[in-house]
Structure formats: C-alpha cells, structure tokens
Regions:
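N-terminal Rossmann-like NAD(P)+-binding subdomain of aldehyde/semialdehyde dehydrogenases
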Residues: 1-126, 154, 297
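Terminal low-complexity tails and localization/encapsulation signals of metabolic enzymes
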Residues: 2-32, 117, 123-134, 335, ...
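Structural signal for hydrophobic packing residues in well-ordered secondary-structure cores
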Residues: 16-23, 46-57, 69-77, 81-84, ...
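ALDH superfamily catalytic-core signature
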Residues: 36, 149-150, 228-354, 358-361
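Flexible, glycine/charged-enriched surface loops at secondary-structure junctions
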Residues: 59-64, 191-195, 271-275, 301-311, ...
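Conserved C-terminal structural/oligomerization subdomain of aldehyde/semialdehyde dehydrogenase
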Residues: 344-474
Length: 474
C-alpha cells in the first residue's frame, strides 16, 4: 500500500502521541528538552546530547537502551520503509523493511566491548573502552532510517550520544526515526536526547557541526562530495564512509546458476542504492552468454546498447561528456520507471535491467557509480583481464568487490589486487553486511579512513591504566 504524505504525518504523529509526553518520565533531564530530540538550535542539540551521554555510563543501562532501540526499529520497520520511499522516491519498501530489520537485529551491542588485561613481572595493565561523548553522524538519503538505527545502536553501546545531520532529502523519515527511538527510551528509562538533530538541516548547520567544540568525533556516511566537505572543514577526528563502484568478476570455473542468483539479488536489492551492491559484471567470455541467460531466467530484462544510451541521456549528468555522473533524480528508481522514461516496455515487476556492453570498459554505466538497477556486463578474454578491468573500474576507492569462482588462486589474486574493505566470494555483496553471510551488520562502511565495517568498537577511545609491581596472583 502506497502512503500519501499526509497519511505518513498522521501515522507518525499518532505513534508519538501514544508513546507519551515529550518531557519523558520522572527523572528525565529538564534542560534542554527539545521535541523528542529535535532542536531549533545546533548549540542546544549538542548541549542536550552532552547531558544525555553521561546517563549511559553503566553497561547495564547501555544494554537496556540498545534493547529498546532494537525493539523500536523492528516495531516500525515497515512504517519507516514506507516513509523513506515516499519522501525520497528511492528504493523498494520490502527491501527497506529488510534493511531496517537487519540493522535492528544484527548490529552488535555492548557485548563486543570487552576490556583487556595484561599482567607480567612489572605489574598489571588494564585497557578499557571509553566513550567519546558526543558524536556527530551525517546520514544519507539512500539508507535513512537504517543508518539512524544502526548508528544509534553502535554509538550508544560505546556510551555516546549522537547529533544526527540527516540528508535534507530524507529529513522527515530520519527525524521520525530519531523521535520514535527517543520516545521509547524516555518511556522506559527517563533518559532524553541520546539522539538529537536540528529541525532544519542546512549546509551552514552541517559546516558548524563539523567544527563544533562540543563534538568529539565526526562520522560521515555518504558520497564523495560530503566526505570531501567533512575532510575540509572537520576539526575533530573523522570516520568516513564514502562512495564505491563495486565490480563482480565471474570466471569460467564458477557455478554460473549460483552466480546469476547472487548477482541478481544483490544488484536489484533496494534498486542498487547500497554502495556495496554489485555495480558492474565482468564475465570471462566463455561463460558470459550462459550467465546472461541465467539472469534473464530470474527476471532481469536485457536492453540493447541503443536503449542503454537513451537511459544514460536522462539518468546521467553530462552524458556523454567527460564529467559524467549519476543524476540524483533517477538514483534508486524502479527499473520499470527508468525503462518507461526511455520508451522501453518491460513488466512492472522488473527489478533489473541488464545491458551487454561487450569490451567497452569506458562505457558510462561501467565507470560511474550510478546506483540504479541498470547493470552493465563486460566480456573479458580471461580471468587475468577481468581482474585488471575490475581494478580499473573500482578506481581505487577501496570499497567492495566480489568474485564467483571455484579457483582459489583466482580468488586470492583478485582479493590482493583489489585491496578493498569488503571482498565477497561466491555470494551477493550484501553477504558482507550480514545478509546471508557471517558477521555483523552496519550501514557505515568506512573505506576512506580505513575502519571498515563499523561497530561499537569503532566508536570508543581506548584508555590504559597501569599498576606497577605487586598485583599478580602467580
């Protein structure tokens, strides 16, 4: 069921009303209060967060708050998914429900923050995980509610409070997630403002946040432009999750049917707006036709080069010029909608458009992170050429790459040459984020600054206490 804007506003308003008064329960901080985490002033928001983080110093309280966030995320997974699609126009409701559920259930909590003790002839040393205090988190329009839920669990697990700076294009859904979580925390603990944001996010607010003296750590989840802006203006430590253009290589030894299913599921998920999703296929020539047929059997619709050119003319900016880039208006749109705009008839249920671009490694859809369900397929002579092309198209971003193969040497060679934070073998790239693979889930994959798949461990300071001599029991 598609929700209209007024319907969404009424639902959120009713949910917040049922959760209780904005002042919280007895014992909630009196100043500053805000509107369930939303403030007119950045200074008030930061001050409220600074007061809040001191109330989650105990692990017992952090565990309780994290459990509340998980419960709230699951309870409102569908509503927040519908809001995100309605507000941004990007992605698919069912896939966003999956993301909201995944981060609610599989983001690690305080349990991963074990202290470390070392003893020896010279005494005892203890290392513990201390909070930063107030963390600023810039969140994207592509994964708005999921990033708020994920970052909240990770950062509060470390004993922090968060000042969120949502993408203006996803302001309503991001702020609704913040308010819903705040309300639930207040209802059960009396603690307000562990999550805060400014009511009207602007470029000026973001710039002030990047250099705010009350913020100790800046976390940016977004594209190259926002990461570069943060690097330019930030006066504190920066953890950045930037862009990617993940290639997937399929060699002649691969299980082709399995590879087709993995790539289809990964590249079509939420209309390809997750940065780790498969963005281009590089198949060894000898199995390229078979791979294509298997993907078409799953529902992918093959389009011609001429049809892909028609799509590129509206879906990419400056096409076919030297500065070609994705047109934000078309990022994350349904495949059927993109096809219709180009005059191509496809079933409304179509999740993925597939275009065979042969050996054209300069094709715009291969070299640009377009974040749409339009997937190019390249044909390489052999696996060595396929890997070389993958390195070229990934552009050194260090984000994600994948390979389907039964040859361990080939997978090892590609993993070494790609040097990406995430490397997936014989599965959809989403497996690296805990969806069908081992490991935990995160919406903040820090590739430019090297932290990788973030968790509570990413958002703590390591403090060491040393007792010299005379405290050993052996």
């Amino acid at each position: 069921m598609e929700l209209r804007e007024r319907d969404v506003e009424l639902i959120v308003s009713e949910v917040l009303k049922r959760l209780g008064p904005s002042g919280g329960t007895q014992g909630a901080p009196a100043s500053p209060v805000g509107d369930f985490g939303l403030f007119d002033s950045l200074d008030d928001a930061v001050a409220a967060a600074e007061a809040a983080y001191k109330k989650v110093s105990s692990m017992a309280m952090r565990n309780k708050v994290v459990a509340i966030i998980r419960k709230t995320g699951l309870a409102h997974a569908r509503m927040l998914a519908e809001m995100a699609v309605q507000e941004t126009g990007m992605g698919r409701v069912d896939d966003k429900i999956t993301k909201n559920t995944l981060v609610s259930e599989h983001t690690p909590g305080p349990e991963v923050l074990a202290p470390r003790a070392m003893s020896g002839d010279s005494g005892l040393t203890l290392e513990e995980n201390a909070p930063w205090g107030v963390i600023a988190s810039v969140t994207p329009s592509t994964n708005p509610a999921a990033t708020v839920i994920n970052n909240s669990i990770s950062m509060i697990s470390g004993g922090n409070a968060i000042v969120f700076a949502p993408h203006p294009g996803a302001k309503r859904v991001s702020q609704s997630a913040i308010q819903l979580i705040n309300k639930a925390i207040i209802e059960e603990t009396g603690i307000a403002n562990l999550l805060v944001a400014v009511k009207e996010p602007t470029l000026e607010v973001a710039r002030r946040l990047f250099a705010h003296p009350g913020v100790k750590l800046l976390v940016v989840t977004g594209g190259e432009a926002v990461v570069e802006a943060a690097r330019k203006h930030a006066t504190m430590r920066l953890i950045a999750a930037g862009a990617g253009n993940p290639p997937v290589v399929v060699d002649e030894t691969a299980d082709i049917r399995r590879a087709a299913r993995s790539i289809y599921d990964g590249a079509s998920f939420d209309n390809n707006i997750i940065c780790a999703d498969e963005k281009e296929i590089i198949a060894v020539e000898s199995i390229a036709d078979q791979l294509k047929q298997e993907m078409k059997a799953l529902g992918a619709v093959e389009i011609s080069l001429e049809q892909s050119d028609a799509i590129a003319r509206f879906a990419l900016r400056d096409y076919p010029g030297p500065n070609v880039a994705a047109n934000p208006k078309w990022v994350g749109r349904n495949a059927a909608l993109i096809a219709k705009e180009a005059g191509i008839s496809v079933p409304e249920s179509c999740r993925l458009l597939l275009v065979d671009i042969g050996r054209d490694i300069n094709h715009a859809f291969a070299r640009v992170e377009q974040m749409m369900p339009v997937l190019p397929l390249l044909r390489a002579r052999n696996v060595e050429e396929a890997i070389a092309w993958a390195v070229l198209l990934e552009r050194g971003l260090g984000h994600t790459a994948g390979m389907h193969s039964r040859n361990i040497d080939n997978m090892h060679s590609m993993a070494l040459q790609m040097n990406t934070s995430l490397f997936v073998k014989n599965g959809p790239h989403l497996a690296a984020l805990g969806a069908g693979g081992e490991g935990w889930t995160s919406m903040t994959i820090s590739t430019p600054t090297g932290e990788g798949v973030t968790s509570a461990r990413t958002f703590v300071r390591i403090r060491r206490c040393v007792l010299v001599d005379n405290f050993r029991i052996v």
